[in-house]
């Protein structure tokens, strides 16, 4: 879980555009964040299994 200071800092515009990075909106994780959903892989899987993300379904092939 990200500290509150990191979450607040992430919402401020960066001084340089190359310093901007994605962070999970739910838990604040900086790695493995899907831009389309704004969530990390762990939160995406949890919410997907609960059925809280419309249009998302488990793949089977």
From Swiss-Prot:
Cysteine disulfide partners in this protein: none
GO:BP terms for this protein?
Answer: translation
Q: Which residues form the signal peptide?
A: none
- Pfam assignment, any one: Ribosomal_S14
Renumbered to this chain, region (Disordered) spans 1-20
Q: Does the keyword Ribonucleoprotein apply?
A: yes
Instruction: Output the superkingdom of the source species.
Output: Bacteria
- Which cofactor(s) does the record list? Zn(2+)
Q: Keywords on this record?
A: Metal-binding, Ribonucleoprotein, Ribosomal protein, RNA-binding, rRNA-binding, Zinc
Q: In which residue ranges is the amino acid composition biased (Basic residues)?
A: 1-14
Subunit: Part of the 30S ribosomal subunit. Contacts proteins S3 and S10.
NCBIfam families assigned: PRK08061.1 (NF005974)
Q: What does this protein do?
A: Binds 16S rRNA, required for the assembly of 30S particles and may also be responsible for determining the conformation of the 16S rRNA at the A site.
- What is the name listed in the Swiss-Prot or TrEMBL entry for this protein? Small ribosomal subunit protein uS14
Which taxonomic lineage does the organism of this UniProt entry have? Bacteria, Bacillati, Bacillota, Bacilli, Lactobacillales
Q: What's the encoding gene here? A: rpsZ
